[in-house]
């Protein structure tokens, strides 16, 4: 991973255009090729980014400014004009063991994989932990029509979970063998804000009854 702290301005050129005026920012260049621009707020969320597969070309323009152009396979560009670099370092992090889910969440995934018809009549499981460039989606399924469906499972469903599934869907829908891919956000509890965001993005919400999945109570589920 490469960490760069620099005064820079950023322009995104593609389906939409966006501009970040000059400011001090953190630039992250990861081993998977992704590039993201961060401010000193917003927790882990970048101001702008380019997901892999993408390619970074560094060049020098007038006034000794550096121009980084990150291009994805669709031809969209993230253009970073660097006025001054304050820090530039690279670090080898090695292979990460990945997120270890708590017992209930991991068991929910296992149970839903075993009873995939809970998602709807005619659903079949393609794979658990289907890997994407930014991590594994919990379940990849096909619905009764044979269309791909990505399922993200949480114990408590909040906005971050919806954002996570949105990123998975963006990547999966770039694969012509899978597209179009729809999403299901499944959790024991789903916060109203998360439900609203999911609905706005065309993601279906499913509230899971853990005890019912284990076969100890009613098998009724609430669909939104």
UniProtKB/Swiss-Prot annotation:
It is found in: Cytoplasm. One of its GO terms (molecular function) is single-stranded DNA endodeoxyribonuclease activity. It is an enzyme of class 3 (hydrolase). Keywords: Cytoplasm, DNA-binding, Endonuclease, Hydrolase, Nuclease. It holds the Pfam family NucS_N. The keyword Nucleotide-binding does not apply. One of its GO terms (cellular component) is cytoplasm. The keyword Protein biosynthesis does not apply. Signal peptide: none annotated. InterPro entries: Endonuclease_NucS, NucS_C, NucS_N, NucS_N_sf, tRNA_endonuc-like_dom_sf. Its EC number is 3.1.-.-. Cleaves both 3' and 5' ssDNA extremities of branched DNA structures. Belongs to the NucS endonuclease family. This is Endonuclease NucS.
């Amino acid at each position: 991973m490469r960490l760069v702290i620099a005064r820079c301005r950023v322009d995104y050129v593609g389906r939409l255009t966006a501009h970040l005026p000059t400011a001090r920012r953190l630039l992250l260049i990861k081993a998977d090729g992704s590039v993201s621009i961060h401010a000193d707020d917003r927790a882990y969320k970048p101001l702008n980014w380019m997901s892999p597969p993408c390619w970074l070309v560094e060049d020098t323009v007038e006034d000794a400014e550096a121009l980084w152009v990150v291009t994805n396979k669709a031809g969209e560009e993230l253009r970073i004009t660097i006025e001054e670099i304050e820090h530039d370092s690279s670090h080898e992090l090695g292979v990460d063991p990945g997120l270890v889910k708590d017992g209930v969440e991991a068991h929910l995934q296992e149970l839903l994989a075993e009873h995939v018809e809970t998602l709807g009549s005619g659903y079949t499981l393609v794979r658990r932990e289907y890997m994407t460039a930014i991590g594994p989606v919990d379940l990849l399924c096909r619905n009764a029509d044979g269309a791909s469906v990505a399922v993200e499972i949480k114990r408590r469903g909040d906005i971050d979970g919806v954002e996570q599934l949105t990123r998975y869907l963006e990547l999966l829908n770039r694969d012509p063998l899978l597209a179009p891919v729809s999403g299901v956000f499944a959790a024991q509890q789903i916060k109203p804000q998360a439900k609203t965001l999911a609905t706005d993005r065309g993601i279906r919400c499913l509230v899971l009854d853990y005890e019912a999945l284990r076969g100890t109570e009613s098998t009724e589920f609430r669909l939104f």
